[in-house]
Amino acid sequence: MNENISVSVRARPFNEKEVKDKEHCLWQFGNNNTITSLPPPITQPVSSLPPISTPIKSSSSSSTSTSAGSLKTPLKTPLKTPLKTPLKTNSTTTNTTVPASPAPTSSLTSKFVSNSYTYDHLFPPTCDNYEVYDTVARELVKSAMEGYNASIMAYGITSSGKTFTMTGSGKKNPGIIPLSIQDIFTYIQECKEREFLLRVSYLEIYNETVNDLLGVNQENFNLKIHEHPVTGVYVAGLKEEIVLSVEHVLSLISAGEAHRHVGSTSYNLQSSRSHTIFKMIIESKEVLPEGSGSGGLESPVRYSTLNLIDLAGSEKASESTISAIRNKEGSYINKSLLTLGTVISKLSEKDTGYIPYRDSKLTRVLQNSLSGNSRVAIICTITLASNNFEESHNTLKFASRAKKISNNAKVNEILDDKALLKQYRNEIAELKSKLSDALSTEKELQETLTEKEKMKITNQELLHKLVDAEKHRSLLESKINNLNKLILVSTSVNNSASKGGSGSGNGNGSRSTFVSPSQNSHHHHGDLGSITPNSFSNLLLQSPSQNNNNNSHISPLSQSTSSLTIGGGSGNGFESNELIQIQSKMAKLELELEEKNKKIDFLTSFNQDSALEKIKQLEGELVQRDMDLGLYQRESTRLQTLLSHKDEKISSLESKLRDILLKFKQIDSENTSLKSKIQEYEVMY
């Protein structure tokens, strides 16, 4: 929007000193926001005042000239007259107590020229800060919340009420700054469709040095001013504090005021010795419903600033200073205000030439507000007293020039990620993504740990299977060895049997002579297990028949037994018992012999080919078992290697998880802090 700077004039009431000195009011508020100067009071010379008891006669022209020529020294205390009814003289009237002074009256009225000025708003001494704020500042504060840059400035002579207008006097009569802050947070509370981020900064310009009132370190003093090709002039290193409530902002202002330079002068016991600029940076973005695209990250961000400026007042060095320090401060204040007046004058004249913004730190900092994209309101404070008539008149002239300046304010929107609000939103999204990754990693780690436990169980099972395979292998090897031994024994027995069957027996082998009766008698007497002592005795008493003539190799034991038995038919009982014992032993031996014969028969029937085939089969099974065992071993090795890799991966994941958890704790702490601040804000509003 293209509009002129809004200019208002506010007059303060007479102070105690002005009332005590009986100063006159030389300015009159009229209709249509017009202020007009009044003529000064008339002074009468002492020599022209006759005694009160002597009536004054009409004066001729000559006496008038003589009386006019006799003017010497005016009265030190001027006559007090009503503001709107100046003294009038009547040359034709006699016997009056007030002397007629046509010559001085004619001279004063001919020299006095009334001055009238019209502004946007006029505030008489009876107006309070609420009325000033509602009329001048409220609309600009709302514009700042809608994306326009705005500046509100208090300008005037010293002790004219600038600081009172901007800051007020406590909670009962707050100024423009606290009322603006209250309105900003009320607007945020009522605006549900947008989200806001507020930052504040507070600086002072003292003796042409820029100081940060919110900083306490040495690097916060004498800050440098730079210019950005897009954003314009800015103060490098100025601290910006994010705020969440009205109380938070007011506490920062209170802390900044404690660092501001103030001093006592002849005009004011607490006079501001520096210019201050309280800035609020407002970022807002439309709140989109959840699930609508990227959550509103692509919507533009409105960026605006609200500057609340309290200027130090101009003053006369001869009257205001009580020390060299105050004199120096006053000279810097007057210099900066003079430069501001020059800049305002050139801007009001639409001068396209050089504008001396750089001649003062004040005009340099205010360059964006005065000549750029900003809505500006200036509140000029004056005093109506006659002792400050010239200073008030100069202030009104400054206000008239400022009213001619036109600015083109527009809504500021940022589409990229330079806005701090969008950066915070992106950071929150990034932190949420990291948190999701951390949770996913934690879940993966849990799954890996579970898999590790399963692999341990599987490995133990494989180890048990491996041990069982080893045992089975040993068993198979033992069976093969036993079979090999049995084959060798069977072969030797077959060889011995073939030698005995050829009839070439000799008397040397007790085994062959013992086996022969069993073999020969087995055919005729059946199973040896059914032999009784009597039958065995009868067997031994039998004579060799013709069928067994070839079996002449009857053992000597049989012969001796036979002879003992024969002789025992008529012997005593002792010999009979001995014979029975021998027969019993022989029966046991025959049973053992039968078992041996059965084994020999089995081994004889078990030929070598089938044994070799069985051995090959067993060897095949053994090879298969070896292959299975090798497979188990390779699988176990693979699982051990995989388990080792998993252990390394688990260690790496645990290390990453610890880092992520540490980062997550930090993020969670920051998030908790932001949530607490947001909750405080929600509770407050």
UniProtKB/Swiss-Prot annotation:
Keyword Plastid found: no
Cited SUPFAM superfamilies: P-loop containing nucleoside triphosphate hydrolases (SSF52540)
Keywords: ATP-binding, Coiled coil, Cytoplasm, Cytoskeleton, Microtubule, Motor protein, Nucleotide-binding, Transport
PROSITE patterns, alphabetized: KINESIN_MOTOR_1 (PS00411), KINESIN_MOTOR_2 (PS50067)
Residue ranges constituting the Kinesin motor domain according to the UniProt record: 4-405
Matching InterPro entries: Kinesin-like_fam (IPR027640), Kinesin_motor_CS (IPR019821), Kinesin_motor_dom (IPR001752), Kinesin_motor_dom_sf (IPR036961), P-loop_NTPase (IPR027417)
Primary location: cytoplasm
Region (Disordered): 36-105, 495-568
Pfam families: Kinesin (PF00225)
Binding site for ATP: 156-163
Cellular location(s): Cytoplasm, Cytoskeleton
SMART domains xrefs: KISc
Entry's Gene Ontology BP terms: microtubule-based movement
GO cellular component, one term: kinesin complex
An example molecular function term from Gene Ontology annotations: microtubule motor activity
Function: Microtubule-associated force-producing protein that plays a role in organelle transport. Its motor activity is directed toward the microtubule's plus end.
Family label: Belongs to the TRAFAC class myosin-kinesin ATPase superfamily. Kinesin family.
The protein's name: Kinesin-related protein 11
Recorded name of the encoding gene: kif11
